[in-house]
Amino acid sequence: MEFTAKANFVRVSPQKARLVLDLIKGQRVEDALNTLLFTKKGIAPAIYKLVHSAMDNANYLSNEKGLDLDLDRLYVKKAIANDGPRMKRIRPAPMGRAFRYQRRISHIEISLAEKPGFQGSTATTVEDEAPKAKGAKGAKAKKAPAKKAAAKKAPAKKFAGKKTAKR
């Protein structure tokens, strides 16, 4: 099941918002929040609030519907920034003229989903590493293939140049 949160009419261009959204796409929610805390882009705090809101939505809906949801297994499934309406503005120009420009607005949407078969902690334990170490020692180490002798290059011929007849 997907849990979404939307922020409409955010005063940032969609291109700038996508830079930050691409950082968190596919990450666990906890990792995404940590990434957003240390991102120096201006839109990062707004996206942080949005991910947190989506996580709260997931918690609320799972309690309402009686779902067994583990918040540690949530990950960012979809993070998109769409264009909103553009605000037309005028910048004064020399000689009484005016130049028009557009302030871009974006609609940001984040969807969280639960990863099936995903363990909450990514750290490996000592018990998990013990069988791996035994298997590595028991296998014979493969030798690297012998290097071929490098072929010697013939020295390059010198260019004699174009000879012209003297008059």
From Swiss-Prot:
Pfam family for this entry, one: Ribosomal_L22
GO molecular function: rRNA binding; structural constituent of ribosome
Domain of life: Bacteria
UniProt KW Nucleotidyltransferase keyword: no
Biased composition (Basic residues): 134-167
GO biological process: translation
Renumbered residue ranges of the record's region Disordered: 120-167
CDD domains named in the record: Ribosomal_L22 (cd00336)
Keywords assigned by UniProt, alphabetized: Ribonucleoprotein, Ribosomal protein, RNA-binding, rRNA-binding
Cellular-component GO terms for this entry: cytosolic large ribosomal subunit
Subunit and interaction comment: Part of the 50S ribosomal subunit.
Role, per record: This protein binds specifically to 23S rRNA; its binding is stimulated by other ribosomal proteins, e.g. L4, L17, and L20. It is important during the early stages of 50S assembly. It makes multiple contacts with different domains of the 23S rRNA in the assembled 50S subunit and ribosome. The globular domain of the protein is located near the polypeptide exit tunnel on the outside of the subunit, while an extended beta-hairpin is found that lines the wall of the exit tunnel in the center of the 70S ribosome.
Family: Belongs to the universal ribosomal protein uL22 family.
Entry protein name: Large ribosomal subunit protein uL22
Source species of the chain: Koribacter versatilis (strain Ellin345)
